[in-house]
Regions:
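Active-site anion-handling motifs in enzyme catalytic cores
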Residues: 1-397
């Protein structure tokens, strides 16, 4: 069986690269002839904002580490599918149903395929796609109807989280079309990493805490943030640990740490920095999934989702971050860890410098590693079970 995976694999984003890698590795391990469809994303502006030294690392990974087809765009997708003679196309993972550009959305809902002569020859399945937004209500009715018709022709349907399923079911389908929730493939990543960790001799495994903050984090309220980092670093030093910053692709945060991982950072090396850390403190969804895959304690500085409540914002500013857990239903971090026993490993990231560094360290030190292990194992089990069912449907068994 030959499949093509249609996903976000080229952006300057570690998570986007690694979810494609994990999917590719998993299906290949099942004896499936697997390709990443080298689709050029119309809405991808990441190369315009990422640090120059980092761009090549993402592009090389997407084109050399992954098994990719020739580069295609909206006009050449059908020709590629014919040329490759795919039995099926997988859509996802990642936020491929984000409505940044309608033409990209059409690609990832696959209505272009179902409107072609290949609709009865090539099957389509969902592979943990996500929305990562608030609403589809502003999409034209004819576009919604096209997407509904396309989804109803998928051989297998799932979504990465409950929020995606909820919004698609309510605003696109009009009924409970998506019923399965399928974990992110990065849960499986650890078993597929076959490279050695590259690091200076001064940095030892499990003797540092890793932090990742937004670019130019200290530009606003810098005095308070620098004091917070200084206190955090001092407390870690007393415990015999270093503070290492791994910058996001856009650029470093501007904080003072013991070491900053230099660009260019290969996505697999990025994962290994998380795996070898004593704990991870930081932003980004796939950094948290990678922590779970690696068994690394984490504190998510959650900036996802949207909450309009002024009272909520005041509570967050005052340090009452648990309020966010009950209100911010669209946060993909909340959707990820709800029901895991790790809900306290997430706080509103906007005002993290208002949280005591001592409390953060104690929270990380007190995380039960067996809880992480059980949660990871359960997600891996669900992923494999869902994909086994998908393969049966594709094969018509």
């Amino acid at each position: 069986m030959r499949i093509g995976i249609l996903t976000y694999h080229t952006p300057c984003n570690f998570g986007a690269n690694l979810q494609a890698y994990a999917s590719y590795k998993y299906f290949t391990s099942q004896g499936i002839d697997t390709w990443i469809i080298n689709y050029s994303l119309l809405s991808d502006k990441s190369y315009d904002i990422v640090a120059e030294a980092q761009k090549e690392a993402h592009w090389n990974f997407s084109q050399q580490t992954l098994r990719v087809t020739r580069v295609v765009n909206n006009d050449s997708l059908l020709d590629l599918v014919r040329e490759m003679n795919f039995d099926a196309i997988g859509v996802g993972a990642d936020a491929v149903w984000n409505k940044r550009v309608v033409d990209d959305l059409r690609v990832f809902f696959c209505d272009w395929l179902f409107k072609s002569d290949l609709k009865d020859k090539v099957k389509v399945f969902a592979l943990s796609p996500a929305f990562m937004g608030q609403t589809y209500s502003d999409l034209p009715l004819d576009v919604k109807n096209d997407f509904k018709s396309a989804l109803e022709q998928f051989t297998y349907l799932d979504a990465r989280d409950q929020w995606t399923a909820h919004v698609v079911n309510k605003e696109i389908a009009g009924y409970e079309l998506i019923k399965n929730i399928n974990p992110d493939p990065v849960f499986l990543l650890d078993k597929f990493v076959d490279v050695e960790w590259k690091h200076p001799n001064s940095i030892l495994s499990k003797k540092y805490y890793l932090i990742s903050l937004p670019k130019n984090y200290t530009k606003s309220l810098g005095f308070l943030k620098r004091i917070w980092v200084k206190r955090l670093t001092s407390l870690l030093h007393r415990r015999g640990y270093q503070l290492v910053e791994i910058p996001i692709p856009d650029g470093a945060s501007g904080i003072d740490s013991d070491y900053v991982v230099p660009y260019p950072i290969d996505p697999l090396q990025w994962y290994l920095w998380i795996k070898n850390a004593k704990g991870y403190i930081g932003v980004r969804f796939h950094a948290i999934v990678s922590s779970l895959s690696a068994g690394t304690p984490f504190l998510s500085l959650d900036t996802y989702g949207k909450v309009d409540s002024k009272i909520h914002k005041i509570f967050s500013y005052l340090g009452f971050h648990k309020n966010d857990h009950f209100i911010n239903k669209s946060s993909k971090i909340r959707n990820l860890i709800d029901g895991s026993g790790l809900e306290d490993c997430r706080i509103n990231g906007t005002f993290v410098f208002m949280v005591s560094p001592r409390k953060i360290i104690e929270k990380l030190e007190n995380i039960d590693l067996s809880t992480i292990s059980k949660f990871r194992s359960e997600n891996v089990r669900i992923f494999k079970s869902n994909m086994a069912e998908m393969i049966k449907r594709i094969k018509g068994i």
